[in-house]
Amino acid sequence: MKPLPVSIATRPRKYTPLSAYACLSDRNKFISVVFSFFFVSSSERVNMSEPEAEAQREPRDSSKKKKKKKKEKRKISEEEEKEEEEREQEEQVEKEEEKSESVLMRGIFKVGKKSHDVLLTPTRLTWTPIIPESPTGEESVVQAGVVLLQDVFAVKVKRRRMAGQQSGGAVLGLALFHSRRRGRRLEEDTLHLHNASAEHTHSWYNTLKELLTGFSCRPRYVKVFINPSSHKKEAVHIYRDHVAPLFKMADIRTDITADGTISVVPLFRLAAIKHTQPLTDRKGHALSVMKECKLDEYDGVVCVGGDGSVAELCHALVLRAQLDANSPENPVRAALPLGIIPAGSTDVVSCSVHGVRDPVTAALHVVLGHLQQVDMCSFLSNGQLVRFGFSAMFGFGGRSLARAEKKRWMSSSRRREYAVVKTLVRLRPEDCQLSFLPAKSSGSSLFGQQDQGEDKELDTKSAEESWVTNQGLYLSISIMSIPCLSPHAPQGLAPNTSLDTGSASLIAVGNASRSEFIKHLKRYSSSSGQFSFPFVETHSVSAVKIRPRSRIGWSEEESEDEGDSKNTPIIQSEAAALPWNIDGELVEIANEVLIRVHPRLIALYGEEVHEAESTVTCSCI
C-alpha cells in the first residue's frame, strides 16, 4: 500500500455528525495511514538499533529499494492501464448496446446549419455532426444527439409553399415532434432534419410512420368530455388552445361531448373533430352518455374538467364494465383508459398521475400512451352501491365541503377558505365506530390480481377475526387509495400510499384541541410531520366500515348557535344525513358506510409520481 503524504495524514479532519458513513470512511483512511506508518517505520526502528548492520546492508538495500520503486511504478502503471481498459470497455459496452440494434436507415441531413450523419434504429434516432479531418490528425470531441422513438408522437414532411398554395410544394426535409421532460412537466419539442431530396425524405418518412404505429398503447380515436362550467369556465379554451393541436398533430380522431350552449365551432376547424350531439353538463350526464356509447369504437376517453367530472367518468366507466360483463355484484376493470386534462380548482387526481396541473403535460401523456394502473374504492351503504371513487373524507372534510357548496356564488378560492375557517370555528368531533381490515404485506393480495378486477369472496370467519374495531370521537376520517397530490399538499394527503398498491390509506384524527388540529392541517403543506401527532393514526387497509353513533346533519348544524361543543357531539334523529366528501363531490349518507379497495380497477393516462408542484398557498390557516 502506498503511504499517504504526511501533510494529508496529519491534516485535521472535520466529521459530519449526520453521516456515519463519512466517519467510517475517514476511520478506514486513518487506519490505512496508521498501518502504512508502522509498516514503514518498523524498519527504521530496527535500523536505529543496529547502525553497524545497516552500514553493511546499505548498498544492498538501496538496490532493493530501486527495484521496489520500479516494481511499484510498474504496478501503478499497470493499475492505471487496467482502469483505462475498464473505462474503455464500459464505453464500448454502451456503444455496443446502441449498435446492437439493427440500423434501419442511415442518411445525411442538416440539423441547424451543419450536416449530420443520422442513424435510425427500431428504438431511437441519433445524429452526429460530420467534421472534416484536422490537418494535424487531431480528433475533435463530437457530441451526438439522440431522440427515443417512444418520445416521438408525430413526423411530418416539410415543404416550401407559395402564398395561397394548399398542397404540394418543394420538399425541405422532415420535422419530428417529440416530448421533452423538464422536471415533472412534459414539453413539446421539434427536431428539424433538412434534406432537399424528395425520394430520400419520403423513404425516411414512411419508415418513421411505420415505427410509430407500432406503439399499440397510443390511442387513435378517443371520446372527449368537456365540462364548460368547471372552475373558471376555461375548459373549452384549454382544450382548443393546448390539447386539440397536439391531438391533431398526432392524428388522433376525437368525438366530443360538451355543453350545447357553448360555441365549439373553432374546435372543429382546428382539430377536425366530429361532434355527435350537444348535451348539457348536468350531474349524471357522463353516466347517461357512457351507458349508450359504443365503447369498442374508441381507444380511450378524455375528460377536460375538474375532480367532479373525473370522478363521474371513472364511476361511469366501471359501471359500464360491470354492465357489459353482467356482473352486478363484483366490480369489473374499466375497458378503456381515461385521460385527464386538468381544468378544475384542485385537480387532485390529475396531480396524482401527472405531478403538475398542466394541460400540455396531460395531453402528451395521452398522445404517447403512458398508462398507469390505479386502484379504486367502492362505497356501499345498506348493501347498495353509492359510487366508485378514489378518496373519501368524513367529519371535517365532509362538513367543509357541505359549507362550500352553499356558497357557490363565491370564487373557488374564497369559497374554500370560508368553508375551512367556518368549520374550524365550529369544530366538533364525530362519535362513531371505526372498523378496518388491515392490508396484507403483499399489497393487492387480499383481492388478488384477478382478471377484470373482480373481488374474491373472503372467508367469513377469518375476515371477522382480522377486522380491527375502534370506537370514539374523531375530528376527521379519510380513506384514500391514491396519494391525492395537489398544489396545496405537494406530498399528498396520503403520502404513505401509492397508485396501485392494492390498499388504501386510513387516516383517523382523534379528538383534539382546535390549535392542535390546525397544526396538523398546516403540516400537509410541508414535506412531512402531519402524522406525528399523538391523536393521529394511520393504517394501510383493504376495507373500512364507519358507523356513526351520535350525529348531526350538516343542514341542522348551520342553524345552530355557535358554542363549545368540542367534547359533546349533538345527537339528532337516526335519519339525519351526514356529509361525505367523495372525490370532491358532496354525498349525504345517513347509515353505515363500507369502503372496499379494488386493485387496478382503472387505467389512467399518466405515470407514478411522488410529489406535485407547489404553486398555491392557502391563507385561511
Task: Mark where each language-model region is.
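ATP/NTP phosphate-donor binding region
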Residues: 2-5, 11-16, 21-26, 39-304, ...
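Conserved beta-strand elements of beta-rich interaction domains across eukaryotes
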Residues: 10, 123-126, 132-133, 181, ...
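Catalytic core of DAGKc-family lipid kinases
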Residues: 52, 236-237, 241, 250, ...
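Eukaryotic intrinsically disordered and solvent-exposed regulatory patches
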Residues: 103-105, 110-114, 139-141, 157-161, ...
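Broad, structure-driven detector of short, well-ordered beta-strand segments within folded domains
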Residues: 114-122, 479, 497, 593-597
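C-terminal helix/juxtamembrane-tail motif
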Residues: 247, 251-264, 585-586, 595-621
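Catalytic phosphate-donor-binding core of small-molecule kinases
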Residues: 369, 419-438, 501-577, 581, ...
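Active-site beta-loop-alpha substructure in enzyme catalytic cores
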Residues: 475-516
